[in-house]
Design a protein with these regions (language model features):
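Glycine-rich beta-alpha loop elements in corrinoid/cobalamin-binding modules
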Residues: 1-58
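Radical SAM [4Fe-4S] cluster-binding motif and immediate context
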Residues: 63-64, 69-192
């Protein structure tokens, strides 16, 4: 959460805000204070030292989320500076993709369960590949980086994704790493 003591702060959003933020903006534009205060994940500074914080909202069906609007961003600027996670990237033209949210683990060093919850939710392979194929075409991508913390949790989805990625023919990696006990015998074959 941003600095709640900052006097320039009126509203904020905690958790997954894709849909809640839109509700908040609509309520503000309609000057509807009652609706503003009902928005899931709303953080509002009431007065010095007092805050209103609503429970956040989880997006259960990640396929409802639109593809990232990368066409509205200066992607060439990102590519120029090499804004990516892995020190071993093979290209500066990196596409960062999230396939899932959540993690069933409770690692003391990690904020993923707090941010995304402990139930892992996956986008469909088709939804993921739609994003990848469009952005590979539009931005001449040279490498794909999956930023999921638990991309190897769901074997069925991972196998399906790997089958589709093979046809794309680009190198890919998981710069956030994977949990060692999620690895399984066939996984080495998939990473080749």
């Amino acid at each position: 959460i941003i600095d709640l003591e900052n006097e320039h702060f009126d509203y904020g959003m905690a958790g997954e805000g894709e849909f809640s933020f839109l509700k908040m903006v609509e309520a503000i534009l309609n000057n509807d204070h009652n609706e503003i205060m009902k928005v899931p994940g709303l953080v509002k500074r009431l007065s010095k030292g007092e805050y209103h914080i609503n429970p956040n909202h989880r997006v259960h069906d990640l396929n409802l989320l639109p593809r990232p609007a990368r066409h509205l961003v200066d992607m060439e600027a990102y590519f120029k500076i090499g804004a990516f996670h892995s020190a071993k990237s093979r290209s500066k033209r990196v596409l960062s993709v999230m396939c899932s949210r959540g993690c069933p683990e409770k690692c003391t060093f990690c904020s993923t369960p707090s941010m995304w919850g402990q139930n892992t939710r996956w986008r469909s392979t088709e939804h993921i590949m739609d994003e990848i194929s469009n952005d590979v075409r539009d931005f001449r991508i040279g490498e794909i980086q999956f930023d999921d913390d638990t991309i190897t949790v769901n074997k069925k989805n991972l196998y399906s994704l790997c089958d589709k990625l093979e046809k794309v023919g680009l190198p890919w990696c998981t710069p956030n790493g994977t949990k060692v006990n999620y690895h399984f015998k066939k996984q080495d074959e998939m990473y080749k």
